[in-house]
Regions:
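Structural preference for solvent-exposed beta-strand-turn elements
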Residues: 1-253
């Protein structure tokens, strides 16, 4: 016998354009964890404060956040499974408007005579606001295609299956280096780069950097450094609604 499903409408209600929800999912879900040790990290957190909706995905090593302005003031904090969100955006058309209802247990997505309901993830989502840098000691504006291509070319050079890249940045040159005792090394200079601030040298996960650049989907990327071994901010200089944060890794040399 097919089980009874409770489709009682939750009390919190807000409306999103389908294109906005698609942007939220494409720019945050990739950063969610794919491991079940901390279930709350496998979902996208929707945190509404007033009429601002902050959507965040993190696996504790990186953060992706998208901010959307709502038509009405709301106050809720829920975490929706990233897989459920992916299924929703596959089902909607760009022209759709989505009514979203939520409480502490479930969320409903209502559009075009369709209801998609999902359970929420229990647990407290981490306070990601505290890792977002509020200032920087240096920054660089780079061509997205050049830096993505440079990182992608070195993807086969790995340490313990992790693709590490070292950024050596100055006002003279910006190098992207990789090294593996078993495979070899590479060193490329970015030719389309505008750099400001003090010199800095940091190692980070190249796969995470590439994911962030691809998710931003812009021609130029702004990379801001807040200091040695401090979080790296990656953003679209023409769109303040989305940002990516990467946690540096202890250097291999």
């Amino acid at each position: 016998e097919y089980p009874d499903i409770d489709f009682t409408q939750p009390n919190h209600h807000f409306v999103l354009k389908a294109t906005d929800l698609k942007s939220i999912v494409s720019q945050t879900a990739f950063a969610c964890s794919d491991k079940d040790q901390r279930p709350v990290l496998t979902g996208v957190n929707f945190n509404s404060q007033g009429n601002m909706l902050y959507c965040s995905g993190t696996d504790s090593y990186r953060l992706a956040r998208k901010t959307i302005e709502l038509d009405s003031s709301q106050d809720f904090n829920i975490t929706i499974p990233s897989k459920s969100l992916t299924e929703v955006v596959r089902s909607v058309s760009d022209e759709d408007t989505i009514d979203i209802f939520a409480d502490s247990k479930k969320a409903q997505f209502v559009f075009d005579k369709t209801i998609i309901q999902t359970r929420l993830i229990d647990g407290t989502f981490p306070d990601v606001q505290r890792i977002i840098p509020t200032s920087c000691v240096s920054k660089m504006l780079v061509d997205s295609y050049e830096i993505a291509g440079t990182i992608d070319r070195t993807n086969f050079i790995r340490n313990d299956k992790v693709h590490l890249i070292k950024l050596e940045c100055s006002q003279t040159e910006t190098h992207i280096k990789t090294y593996s005792s078993e495979i070899g090394n590479s060193d490329e200079v970015l030719t389309k780069c505008e750099y400001e601030g003090e010199e800095i040298s940091l190692t980070c996960n190249g796969t995470y950097m590439l994911d962030a650049i691809k998710a931003l989907g812009c021609e130029k990327v702004l990379i801001e450094f807040s200091g040695f071994m401090k979080p790296i901010k990656v953003s679209n200089p023409e769109d303040a609604s989305v940002l990516m944060i990467l946690v540096p890794i202890r250097s291999y040399d």
